[in-house]
Regions:
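Conserved inter-motif catalytic segment of the P-loop NTP-binding fold
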Residues: 61, 81-144
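Short alpha-helix boundary/capping motifs
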Residues: 68, 115-116, 151
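Substrate-engagement module of ASCE P-loop NTPases
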Residues: 153-156
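Short, solvent-exposed loop/turn segments at secondary-structure boundaries
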Residues: 145-149
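Detector for small/aliphatic-rich hydrophobic stretches
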Residues: 1-87, 98-104
Length: 156
């Protein structure tokens, strides 16, 4: 068991090396590179935007929940910044008529026929690391296919 002198020396050493710990302040962590969505409230909630090269799950409760509007706003913002958005469309359901031609020019649209195909495609794209923003849309995929997705698949 350490004596009082050793404890005092340890505290002094830690205070010199980690002054923020003494003040009850957590060390500042470096934030991952983020890509702004163009929606101020969302960017603030996410600490600057979506993590670049990462995976973020957005869940929409159903029809009319705003997921298409979110995707359109994200695409417009990405295009305005001169970047590309990669959309893995799990049910080949994107309404391209609703998008502006300028935004479409910055969209890599991968049309899939099944949930499994969409997941494999997304996995390959995320491993590549050359694509800054990948969106996987499974909203219209059949529920029985979605229930077969293993929970561990989402961890990176």
């Amino acid at each position: 068991m350490p004596n009082d002198t050793q404890i005092i020396e340890l505290r002094r050493f830690l205070a010199e090396r980690l002054p923020q710990a003494r003040l009850g302040i957590a060390p500042r962590r470096t934030a991952p590179d983020t890509l702004a969505t163009g929606i101020e409230a969302v960017d603030q909630a996410l600490g600057g935007g979506l993590p670049k090269g990462g995976f973020t799950e957005l869940v929409a409760p159903g029809e009319g929940s705003g997921s298409a509007q979110f995707l359109h706003a994200l695409l417009r913002h990405t295009a305005a910044a001169g970047r590309f958005l990669t959309l893995v469309d799990g049910a080949d359901s994107l309404d391209v008529d609703a998008l502006e031609p300028e935004a479409l020019a910055h969209l890599l649209w991968i049309r899939c026929r099944s949930t499994a195909e969409a997941l494999q495609t997304t996995d390959l794209l995320l491993r590549d690391r050359n694509i800054a923003l990948v969106v996987l849309d499974l909203k219209l995929n059949p529920a029985h296919e979605l229930r077969r997705i293993q929970g561990t698949l989402w961890y990176r």
